Every structure is written in structure tokens, then in C-alpha cells.
């Protein structure tokens, strides 16, 4: 049986493993590495704080994630792949209530971003 997401080290493992997958993905990697030219040493700690805030209520993340995504050349297919990779990463590493919550939160974030980008209608 896998363990649930319980510690900051678990958040780091989740984020690092997920973005390793993103960097190997033929659809998502160009968005992050070619278009956005993400500085991973800067970006990953932000993502650790973001998911710590989302899952643990740590309030470590201070920011507005949506505006940074506005200029990205993404469509529904990108969001579907992002969710698929995130969900697979969670399934590979964790199970339990907090892992389930992470899947639900990620799906909700993706849905809101797609609505705000005009990729889907409100439902």
C-alpha cells in the first residue's frame, strides 16, 4: 500500500516527479521550455509552496498563478495532458484522502484556467 501525501518532502517528490514527466512530454515540454523558458531552479520551489498551501493550508504561496498562464500557447489538449500526467504521478506515488484531494484540486484549477482562457464554457 502506498502512503498518502503527509509531509513537505512528499510535496517535493510529487512536484519533482510531475515536472520530470512534463519535461519529457512532447506536447507540454515545448510550452514550458521553449515558449515560457522556465527557470526550473526558480519555478520548482514556487510549486512546492503552491501545493503546500493547497494541500496543507500552509499559506507558503503568495501569488496569482493565472496571469502567468495568459501568454502561453495552450489549448484543451494541453490541459488534458497536464491533468493526465498529474493524475498518473499521484497514482504512481500516493494513495489516500490527501492524494484524492490533490487530484480534485488539480482538476478544479485546470477547469477554472480553461474557463478564464475561453477554452471551455461555464458549467
What is each of the regions a protein language model found here?
Residues 1-123:
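Core of compact, soluble alpha-helical bundle domains
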